């Protein structure tokens, strides 16, 4: 099982009101310059919110939620400090998230 950490908010807030693109660009540049593999993903309408243990989060962001998921708890805590109005939490899952499993293509 892998522990995934997440920051959760409404899609409108994260995609329209916050400089999320800038945050991700800076983070990706940092990872690339340090030869680290990307360990975070932006997931609209995350299915993990349907788990019974996640009901409190689903109630906080009931419609059109979006999650930033990572295996790095420090990054998620940093996002909470950087962005502010997000819920943070964690869950365990046997799913292995990767560029391949999410069909992510690097654009050059």
From Swiss-Prot:
GO CC field: chloroplast
Location in the cell: Plastid, Chloroplast
Keyword annotations from UniProtKB, A to Z: Chloroplast, Plastid
InterPro entries reported in the protein's UniProt record: Ycf54, Ycf54-like_sf
Stretches that traverse the bilayer: none
UniProt cross-references to PANTHER family, sorted A to Z: PTHR35319, YCF54
Family membership: Belongs to the ycf54 family.
Listed name of the protein: Uncharacterized protein ycf54
Organism: Porphyra purpurea (Red seaweed)
